[in-house]
Design a protein with these regions (language model features):
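Active-site beta-loop-alpha junctions enriched in small/polar residues
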Residues: 16-20, 40-42, 63-67, 98-100
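Flexible, acidic glycine-rich loops studded with aromatic residues
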Residues: 75-130
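Short secondary-structure capping/turn micro-motifs that flank functional sites
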Residues: 22-23, 45-46, 69-70, 100-102, ...
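Short, basic, glycine/proline-bearing loop/turn elements
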Residues: 33-35, 61-68
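Histidine/acidic residue-rich metal-binding segments in metalloenzymes
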Residues: 1-15, 19-35, 44-58, 75-90, ...
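Divalent metal-coordination and catalytic microenvironments
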Residues: 16, 37, 60, 96, ...
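Mid-to-C-terminal alpha-helical segments outside catalytic/metal-binding sites
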Residues: 117-153
Length: 153
């Protein structure tokens, strides 16, 4: 009922889902109207659920260092960032809780670059994804796109 009211007001929202628990939590969150999923780790290996999120252009807010600290993946080698990028999900890199994780976006990007062979092109794509799924006005997004375009040159 509450999510219905939020949708009626056209307020975008994120639901933390899939950090632990099943992929069904993610699917339920999207069905409730979430336009972004915090973490989304449970999508790992779930081709139909990945397609479901991709087709609906759901942002996947990955928090690599936090996910390592909380052991959201049993084996850090299985962290699904490359899987999600290769599936063309709208992956973004996030800090989760900077003060708890003692991290910054710079540290997050350095970690995934070193540990998961994330390329500069993928970093740029994730930054573009962040602009695309941002809960910001069109004017703010336009300013960000211009900065991004300048940065790429």
């Amino acid at each position: 009922e509450l999510f219905g009211e939020v949708r009626r007001l056209e307020m975008p929202f994120t639901i933390h889902a899939g950090e632990c628990g099943s992929v069904q939590n993610i699917l339920d969150a999207v069905q409730c109207g979430a336009s972004r999923i915090g973490h989304g780790i449970a999508l790992h290996g779930q081709k139909e659920a990945i397609a479901f999120c991709r087709d609906r252009q759901i942002g996947i807010e990955m928090c690599p260092l936090s996910n390592m600290q909380t052991k959201a993946v049993k084996d850090p080698a299985e962290y699904p960032i490359q899987e999600f990028l290769n599936a063309n999900l709208l992956v973004t890199v996030n800090t989760d809780n900077r003060t708890v994780s003692q991290t910054t976006l710079e540290k997050e990007f350095a970690f995934i670059r070193e540990r998961y062979a994330v390329t500069r092109e993928q970093e740029v794509q994730m930054t573009k994804n962040a602009i695309e799924v941002a809960f910001a006005s069109d004017a703010v997004k336009e300013r960000l796109w211009k900065k991004m375009y300048t940065f790429e040159k």
